[in-house]
């Protein structure tokens, strides 16, 4: 696989994020599939306490060539972190932080899987609708539990652009009900 990126990886202290275009082939059980699509690479070297607080991670690509990524804590009246970026179709990179990254109106089903949400990263506002889920139940050695619903999503902006990507939520048990239930 070849990952071509329009910009240098967005680096944080213990991780990096990079929007890419992925080409190559994958062979499984003798069947080869050609890959030619937008992608996202991220890697983390840091220690993660999944049971500490709720957060959201989102990355996607729109049909006009816009790419975006953000991660932020989701705690009412408390901001622990909020960081991300957008890349315009012409390759212009814009960092986003703090109140430039909004996760709002997260609607979940009875299993705590996301049904929809409204988000904004910098100047890019969009709604997300999951089309496939890959949830993970995280259990700490001391018994604490966090639900980690991950979803492949379709995105749509108010001006009609559409795209696809991935969103993840981390919902540790014991936090107040921060969600809208479907």
Which residue stretches match the model-derived regions?
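Structured soluble/peripheral alpha/beta segments that form catalytic or ligand/cofactor-binding pockets
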Residues: 1-182
């Amino acid at each position: 696989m070849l990952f071509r990126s329009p910009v240098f990886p967005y680096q944080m202290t213990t991780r990096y994020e990079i929007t890419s275009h992925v080409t190559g082939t994958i062979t499984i059980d003798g069947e080869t599939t050609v890959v030619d699509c937008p992608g996202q690479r991220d890697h983390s070297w840091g220690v993660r306490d999944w049971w500490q607080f709720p957060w959201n991670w989102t990355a996607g690509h729109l049909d006009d060539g816009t790419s975006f990524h953000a991660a932020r804590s989701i705690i009412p009246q408390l901001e622990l972190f909020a960081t991300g970026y957008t890349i315009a179709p012409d390759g212009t990179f814009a960092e986003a932080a703090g109140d430039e990254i909004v996760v709002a109106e997260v609607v979940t089903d009875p299993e705590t899987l996301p049904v929809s949400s409204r988000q904004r990263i910098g100047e890019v506002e969009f709604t997300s609708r999951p089309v496939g889920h890959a949830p993970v139940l995280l259990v700490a050695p001391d018994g604490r539990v966090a639900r980690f619903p991950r979803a492949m999503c379709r995105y749509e902006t108010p001006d009609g652009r559409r795209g696809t990507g991935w969103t993840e939520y981390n919902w540790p048990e014991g936090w107040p009900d921060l969600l809208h239930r479907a």
